[in-house]
Amino acid sequence: MAQISKCSSLSTELNESSIISHHHGNLWDDDFIQSLKSSNGAPQYHERAEKLVEEIKNLVVSEMKDCNDDLIRHLQMVDIFECLGIDRHFQNEIQVALDYVYRYWNELEGIGIGSRDSLIKDFNATALGFRALRLHRYNVSSDVLENFKNENGQFFCSSTVEEKEVRCMLTLFRASEISFPGEKVMDEAKAFTTEYLTKVLTGVDVTDVDQSLLREVKYALEFPWHCSLPRWEARNFIEICGQNDSWLKSIMNKRVLELAKLDFNILQCAHHRELQLLSRCWWSQSDIAQQNFYRKRHVEFYFWVVIGTFEPEFSTCRITFAKIATLMTILDDLYDTHGTLEQLKIFTEGVKRWDLSLVDSLPDYIKITFEFFLNTSNELIAEVAKTQERDMSAYIRKTWERYLEAYMQEAEWITAGHVPTFDEYMKNGISSSGMCILNLYSLLLMGQLLPDDVLEQIHSPSKIHELVELTARLVDDSKDFETNKVGGELASGIECYVKDNPECTLEDASNHLNGLLDLTVKELNWEFVRHDSVALCFKKFAFNVARGLRLIYKYRDGFDVSNQEMKTHIFKILIDPLT
């Protein structure tokens, strides 16, 4: 994103030979991508997976019949299916289990263990039930957690570290992450359990706690709900469960783990094919790939979408997302550092008119950029027309126009050395985040008709879309500040806030942005679970795009510097199979 500074480089004449890139190059050579081959996608593995699904369904029926009274067994089944990433195979079983639990849910006291009618309500069962029911959009109130506080207002907790209590605190921590704005008890639960679990990991007296449980605690603290995407969680939990000998004593658990590994590897093979198509047939054959001063991050952007939207039926959506995100990054680089203000005005006008001839007077590298933009956009507009059974080119072009106008505003601020107010910056920065255009193409190519009235509820100016845009802006600015402060540079949102509030330190401004981000997470939770006419797959997509940013920006800007944690993440999800 363009940085607010007194740099006037945009007013200087630029040509291709004078451009210097300050970013590392492409980490994913096409030859390497094309070399990704595995037998895990062979028919026999699909057949084995299908057989395991049927076996597990039969085991579920048998086990649920045997423990029909035990509500926590139903919840544990749902939780393990979801953590291991195989829940899509058992949607009916999950629905039946949660309906059954909800039937006996007490809004004031939660649920008990041992018997569905137990008068003694259980902390762990209630926290587990609350989380599962809320995530599946059942109406449950967080007030139920008040029932598990002592007379001093503290959550029940003994002075010794015991496995049962650690499990209970972990379950409460995970439940507290699915909070809505204004839920004080959820904030209290999160603060309490975070402190407790952190002490557990750093303590010495944990000999009575199973190592697999400690691994779960470590994962939960390092990758909270807002940055624990389905594929990422599945890979990590498969590894954790595979080391839990006591858990694997169960026949059903062995089958579940075998299916989880097979399913992960089968999907990874499908994702290899999509990556190969993206790399060979789109990126490597384009002239833009030879422009070495642009960031080349098509694999990183594919990772962003696949960790949240991984199912086979969304292949076109994933490839589209990676293409548009790559294109947006190239435009970001152009408007940020590689074009003069006059050149950018001409480029923007060319987009408004959708006319390649308007950029004839510009340097070759900008003409190549414009042609790449136009070709990619027109190709995807044609795809959208087929899927949505109507011409949406005018709507899409208008969205591109608004996006580039926001970039132009930033370019003008940079050239003038102007630092806007925080509100001005955020209003423009939300548009320049690119979420509007990025999500639009992807949502339209998810394979389902998206009528205009539903599109309005999931896309601009809907609340959920506004929150995704805000997340993108806040995450980017917060991490820019952390990354750049050592070198004396300021992330633009931080600088604007300090300008408006001279009494604030940079740390104060950073804390303010992080506070806004925490509130945004809670509002996104609410928008995700509330019932409306928007299909859940569309909500999940937008929700997971926002969560994906939190993972990718966890340590640093993972797109700008993708040769560290990001590279490791990509190998773990897209390259290395499970054994």
UniProtKB/Swiss-Prot annotation:
EC number(s) reported in the record: 4.2.3.80
This protein's pathway: Sesquiterpene biosynthesis; Terpene metabolism; oleoresin biosynthesis
Residue ranges of coiled coil: none
Free-text comment on the cofactor: Binds 3 Mg(2+) or Mn(2+) ions per subunit.
Highest rank taxon of the organism: Eukaryota
Keyword Kinase set for record: no
Residues that bind Mg(2+) 2: D332, D336
Class of this enzyme: lyase
UniProt keywords, alphabetically: Lyase, Magnesium, Metal-binding
Cofactors demanded by this protein: Mg(2+); Mn(2+)
Short motif (DDXXD motif): ranges: 332-336
Entry-linked PANTHER family: OS04G0344100 PROTEIN-RELATED (PTHR31225)
Record note on domains: The Asp-Asp-Xaa-Xaa-Asp/Glu (DDXXD/E) motif is important for the catalytic activity, presumably through binding to Mg(2+).
Task performed by this protein: Terpene synthase (TPS) involved in the biosynthesis of sesquiterpene natural products included in conifer oleoresin secretions and volatile emissions; these compounds contribute to biotic and abiotic stress defense against herbivores and pathogens. Catalyzes the conversion of (2E,6E)-farnesyl diphosphate (FPP) to alpha-longipinene.
Family, as annotated: Belongs to the terpene synthase family. Tpsd subfamily.
UniProt-recorded name of the protein: Alpha-longipinene synthase
Classification lineage: Eukaryota, Viridiplantae, Streptophyta, Embryophyta, Tracheophyta
Gene field: TPS-Lonp
